[in-house]
């Protein structure tokens, strides 16, 4: 897998437009890759923001991105290698949803308790147990597809989870890292980043 971290200038007008529209940000990320990707490729990304700065964390399985201009990304290659009982720090920005009935639309899950339950269920399916987690409400992200594709904007409820997990099933965890967790993976959700428990680096 290939991990890329790109620092963004939040004072740049183009960056401001992308940060205000999840669909525009999706298009910006995908513009770094060839139009035709291998069928088994999966591009995941996460926007990280704080006062006065922003960065994009991007993950691809096999395709290296390209770019022009004054970008100085950090690029590393990693391969998931976990073992049962291993403790790892994690970060995940997700769009917690549930199905409204057997065939109904997906609706946002709301509230700290429901978000934690959602994470626990996803962890069980993805081969890990949550040992500790902080939950941050990131609000609702909005995106606008060009007409006439969609008349209504994209609205995504975003929640960030940071904490520690224990590996239960290394193969399932590796699959979750490669392919993401939850919905809205094309719009900055689902990238599960893992690191050592004594490090803030993901």
Q: What do these predicted regions represent?
A:
Residues 1-202:
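RNA-interacting cores
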